[in-house]
Amino acid sequence: MDKLPPSMRKRLYSLPQQVGAKAWIMDEEEDGEEEGAGGRQDPSRRSIRLRPLPSPSPSVAAGCSESRGAALGATESEGPGRSAGKSSTNGDCRRFRGSLASLGSRGGGSGGAGGGSSLGHLHDSAEERRLIAAEGDASPGEDRTPPGLATEPERPATAAQPAASPPPQQPPQPASASCEQPSADTAIKVEGGAAASDQILPEAEVRLGQSGFMQRQFGAMLQPGVNKFSLRMFGSQKAVEREQERVKSAGFWIIHPYSDFRFYWDLTMLLLMVGNLIIIPVGITFFKDENTTPWIVFNVVSDTFFLIDLVLNFRTGIVVEDNTEIILDPQRIKMKYLKSWFVVDFISSIPVDYIFLIVETRIDSEVYKTARALRIVRFTKILSLLRLLRLSRLIRYIHQWEEIFHMTYDLASAVVRIVNLIGMMLLLCHWDGCLQFLVPMLQDFPHDCWVSINGMVNNSWGKQYSYALFKAMSHMLCIGYGRQAPVGMSDVWLTMLSMIVGATCYAMFIGHATALIQSLDSSRRQYQEKYKQVEQYMSFHKLPPDTRQRIHDYYEHRYQGKMFDEESILGELSEPLREEIINFNCRKLVASMPLFANADPNFVTSMLTKLRFEVFQPGDYIIREGTIGKKMYFIQHGVVSVLTKGNKETKLADGSYFGEICLLTRGRRTASVRADTYCRLYSLSVDNFNEVLEEYPMMRRAFETVALDRLDRIGKKNSILLHKVQHDLNSGVFNYQENEIIQQIVRHDREMAHCAHRVQAAASATPTPTPVIWTPLIQAPLQAAAATTSVAIALTHHPRLPAAIFRPPPGPGLGNLGAGQTPRHPRRLQSLIPSALGSASPASSPSQVDTPSSSSFHIQQLAGFSAPPGLSPLLPSSSSSPPPGACGSPPAPTPSTSTAAAASTTGFGHFHKALGGSLSSSDSPLLTPLQPGARSPQAAQPPPPLPGARGGLGLLEHFLPPPPSSRSPSSSPGQLGQPPGELSLGLAAGPSSTPETPPRPERPSFMAGASGGASPVAFTPRGGLSPPGHSPGPPRTFPSAPPRASGSHGSLLLPPASSPPPPQVPQRRGTPPLTPGRLTQDLKLISASQPALPQDGAQTLRRASPHSSGESVAAFSLYPRAGGGSGSSGGLGPPGRPYGAIPGQHVTLPRKTSSGSLPPPLSLFGARAASSGGPPLTTAAPQREPGARSEPVRSKLPSNL
C-alpha cells in the first residue's frame, strides 16, 4: 500500500462505503498495516474512515499535515511513540467494530515502538497474518463488547508520547502534539468521553483477554470438529472448515448438530431420560409418600436439565431429512421447532405436579387435609405421568445415534438397532407392569382386582412389582394371564390393552430381527434367490436329471453359497485399491506359479488385473485341438490333462498355465485340455495378453521359450516360435540376468511337469494290477476264438485274476506322428512302470505269488518300448539291478549281467540296456541326451549258459530252431526300414555278425517231436535297402541265442529244464498248481488252429506304429532263413522253408490290421533274439526283498501262437 500513489490509496479507502461490511473489515485490516508502519499516513484519512465520529477542525488537520511534511526527521524519531499511540487508539476503535485485524495492528504498533518504523511495519504485517490464519474472521459475538473500553490504550499511548519525544529542539513539535490531541479526544468522544474510565483500563484489558480465550474455546465446541464422522458427513477437511465458517457467520450461540458440545449433551440427556423413564413409573406406582427429599431433588434436577435442553433446542441446527441440508438460521430453527416437538417437550419438562401441590396447599390447609387429600394425590400422580412424554425425546435421540453409528460403523449400527429394539420392548413391559398395579391402587384396591385376590396389598414393593411384571409379560407375549384370569372390569380392559401392545411389539420385533438377519448375510440370500430361478428354468425346459445335477454342482463350486457382483464392486473402487484387492485374492495363484515368482511385480499386477475367474467340471474340455485360441488359462486349483492326437497325455496341476502357444503364434490349438477334477482357473484373453506383453518384452520371450520347450516335450515343433527365440538370442536383446531368469522359468516348468507325471504314476498304481498277458487278446484278429479256448479256461483256475481281464484297446489313428515325435504313450508307460518295478514281484507282493502272469511278463513289456526323455527320473535306480536269482536262476551272474547292472545304476540305464541299443540307432533328437556312451563288444555278446541253471527253456522253445552259426548275419536296427524320425523298433544291436552261441544242453522229451524242420526267425525290410546312415545289406536273421533266466521273452515262455528246481513259494490253500503238461496241450490247440503268415507281412510289421511298439502284442511274422548254417543242437529246416509253431503249418497275420493293433516286431522272439546282441534284461527286473524266496519261472502263453 505504501508504494501506491495517494489517489489510488484514497480510492481504496473509500471502498468500504460502497461495498458491504466484509469489505469494510478488509479495508481496515490493510489500513492497520499502514498505521503500524510508523505514522506516515495523513491524519485526514482517519477522518474519512471514522465518518460517524466528529472530525477535528480543518485548520488543526492542515497544521498536522504541514508539520509532518515539513520535518520528516522529527517524524521518524518520534514515529515509534506516536504510531503506538495512534494504532492503539484506532485499533481498539476498530476492534469493537468487529475486525480481528486490530489485534495485529496493536501488536505491530507495540513492536514498532521498540525499533524503527520499517521494522514495526514488518512485525505488524507478520503478526496480523499469523492471527488471521490461526483464528479466521472475528465472530459476531465480538461486536457486543462494551464500547467503554475503547479508550483503554489511550493512557499508555499518551504517556509514551513525551518519553519518546526529545526536548523542544524542533519547531513542529507542538504542531505534532496538537495533531495528536484531536485524535485522542475524538476517540474519547466516541466511547463516551468519561474520564473515570481511564482508571480501570488495565483490569478491563485482562478480563477481556480471559473472556476472549474462553469464548473462543467454547465457540470451537459449538462447531463441527475434524473427526471421522465429520469427514464422512461432509467429504473433506475443506468442507468441514466451510461448515465451521457457516456456524460463525450464522449468529451468536448457534450450535451445530454435529459439534462436540451437542454430542456430549445428547449423551447426558440420553442417560437421564432412561433413568427417568424407569424410576418415575416405579416411584409413582409403588411408593405412596412422594414428598421425601430424595424424590423431590431427583425430580427438580431432572426437570431443570430438561428445561435447559428445551432452550438449547432453539439454538441447535436442524438436520433436514436425508442429510441434504443443515439449517443454521435462528429464525428457521425457531419456527421449525415450534411446529414439531416443542409442545410435547415443554409439557414433559414443566413440573406440573409440584405447581399443582403448591397452589393447592395455599388455598385451604384444612380442606386439603380432610376431604380433598386423596383426590389431590391421585391427580398429582396422573400429572406426574406427563414426564413419561420424554419418551418421544428418547426415541429421537436414539434414532440420531443410530444414524451416527450407521455412518461410522456398519456392524455397530446393526448391533445398536437390535439393542434399541430389545430395550424398547423391555421398557414397555416395565411400564405395563407398573400400569397393572397402578390402576387398582388408584381405585383403592377393590375386592375383585388381582392384587386383592392374591392378597398382595400389604406386601413389599418388590414382590408387588415382580407379580405385576409377570402378569404384564404374559399378556404381551400372548401366553397367559399371569397367576389367574382377570375378574374385574378394569383388569379385563387392562389385559386387552396389554395384548394389543404386546402383539404389536412382537410383530415389530420379528420383522426387525428378520430384516437384520437378512442384511447380515445378503450375499447368501442373493445366491438362494438366484438358484431358485435356476431351478424354475430347469423345470420349465424339462432338463434331464444328470444335467440338473451338473448345473447344481457347478453353482456350488462356482459361487460356494454366496453371490457377489464382483465386477461392479471392483469397478467402483479406485485403481490402487482395486489392484491391492486383486493381488490379495490371487495370492495363492502367485505363490504356486513359478512364472509369477520370477517375474517383475508390475508385470504380475498388470496380469492379475486382467484375469477372469472361471470354473470347470470334471470331463469338460477347456480347449480343443485345432480350434482358434482366444484365451490362456492359469490353474489355481485342480488337475487337467493335455491330450494330443498321438495320445500323448500330460498332467498339469496347481500353479501351471496352458493355452499360451496359439496366443503367441496366432495359430490353432496344438492340443486339447480336459479337466480331470473341479478346476478353478483364471482366464486371460488374447487382447489383454498382447497388451501386457507389449509392455514387458522379457516376459514374452519367457512365454515363447517355455512354449518351445513344451512343444519339444510332446514331439512337436513350431518354426515361428523357433525363429523368434533364435532371433532374440542372436541379436542379444536381453542381458545375462534376463536370460538367467528365463532359463529359471523354463526349469521350473519342467519340474512341474515331472511332478505331475509322478503324481499320475502314483495314482495309476493299483494293489492288484491287471495281467498284461491278456492285453493282445483284444488287439488280435482272433479275439473271439482265443477267448473260447481251453487256455482261457485253464488260466481262470487261479482265483486272484481280476474280473476285468480284457481291457479295451487304445484308439486308432495313432500312426500319424510327426518326424520329431516321441512314439510312446505316457499312460501306458506309467501303468507299466509301477507294476514292473514295484508291485509285480511275486516275492514282494504276497497276493500275487500264485498269479501266472506277473512280474516276468512286465519285464517283457519293459523291453519293448522306449521312454521319452522326461521320464527318466521316474525309474528308480534301486530296482535296476536285481539279484541274479530273481527269476529262478542260481546266484552266479554272468559278465554281461554285471555290466548291465553297473550301467543301469544311472537314471535311464536299465531301460537303455534292456532295449539293446535301439535308442542309439534312433534319429529322434529328443532322445539324444539319454543315450549312454559306446559299449564294448563284449557287452553285446550273449552270455554262455549257466551250468547249473534250467537254461530258461519254456514251451515255445520246442517249436524254435537252434541258434544259427556265426556265418548267419544278424539284423541291425537300421535294417527294419523305419524312417529316421521314428524310434528303432528292433532290439538287437552291435556288429553285423554275432558270435556263435553255445548249444543247448538238452531238450525235454515230451516236446521232442515238435522240433523237426524248425528254422530261425528272420525279418526282412520291405524296401530292400536300409535308410541312409545304416549299413545296407541283404535281409538279416536274428540268431536265436540260448535263453537265460534274466527276463527275455523266450525265457518267460519256456518251461523249466531238468536242472534242480529252486525252492517253491508256498501256494495258497485251495489253489492247485497248473501243470506244464496241460498248458502244453492248450498251446497245441491254439497254435494248430492258426493259419500261416504271408511273406509280405513284414511290410506291415516294419511300419509298426509308435503306439503299438509300446504294447506287448505277441503277433509276429516268421520268415525263412537268409543263409544256412549248422546249428549246435537240433536239426535245422531247409533254406527258404517257412515254418510255423507246428511243422507244416504257416502262421499268418491278416494284412488289414490297424496301426493301433499292430504288434511290434520281436515282441516275443525278437526279444529273445535280441538277447544275443544286447545286454540281458535283468536290469528291468523288479527288486526282491533280501529275505524273500525266489519263485520258479512259470510258463507264459502268448495269445496268438
From Swiss-Prot:
Residues 287-293, 360-378, 437-464, 487-491 are extracellular. Activated by cAMP, and to a lesser extent by cGMP and cCMP. cAMP binding causes a conformation change that leads to the assembly of an active tetramer and channel opening. Binding of cAMP removes a tonic inhibition conferred by cyclic nucleotide-binding domain (CNBD) on channel opening. Cyclic dinucleotides can modulate HCN4 channel; cyclic dinucleotides acting as potent antagonists of cAMP. Inhibited by extracellular Cs(+) ions. Auxiliary subunits can also regulate HCN4 channel. 3',5'-cyclic GMP binds at residues 559, 562, 564, 566. It is a multi-pass membrane protein. It is found in: Cell membrane. The keyword Nucleotide-binding applies. 3',5'-cyclic AMP binds at residues 659-660, 662, 669-670, 673, 710. It catalyses: K(+)(in) = K(+)(out); Na(+)(in) = Na(+)(out). Its main location: membrane. Residues 164-174, 881-894, 1029-1042 have a biased composition (Pro residues). Residues 465-486 dip into the membrane without crossing it. Residues 1-263, 315-336, 400-413, 518-1201 are cytoplasmic. Residues 831-856, 866-880, 915-939, 967-995, 1045-1056 have a biased composition (Low complexity). Residues 105-118, 1122-1134 have a biased composition (Gly residues). It holds the Pfam family cNMP_binding. The modification Phosphoserine is found at residues 139, 1105, 1108. Homotetramer. The potassium channel is composed of a homo- or heterotetrameric complex of pore-forming subunits. Interacts with PEX5L with a 4:4 HCN4:PEX5L stoichiometry; reduces the effects of cAMP on the voltage-dependence and rate of activation. Interacts with IRAG1; regulates HCN4 channel activity. Interacts with IRAG2; regulates HCN4 channel activity. Belongs to the potassium channel HCN family. Contains six transmembrane segments (S1-S6) and an intervening P-loop. The segment S4 is the voltage-sensor and is characterized by a series of positively charged amino acids at every third position, while the S5-S6 segments together with the P-loop form a centrally located pore of the channel. Contains a cyclic nucleotide-binding domain (CNBD) in their C-terminal region. The CNBD is connected to the pore forming transmembrane segment via the C-linker. Contains a unique pocket located in the cytosolic C-terminal domain, identified as a likely binding site for di-cyclic nucleotides. Hyperpolarization-activated ion channel that are permeable to Na(+) and K(+) ions with very slow activation and inactivation. Exhibits higher selectivity for K(+) over Na(+) ions. Contributes to the native pacemaker currents in heart (If) that regulate the rhythm of heart beat. Contributes to the native pacemaker currents in neurons (Ih). May mediate responses to sour stimuli. This is Potassium/sodium hyperpolarization-activated cyclic nucleotide-gated channel 4. It comes from Mus musculus.
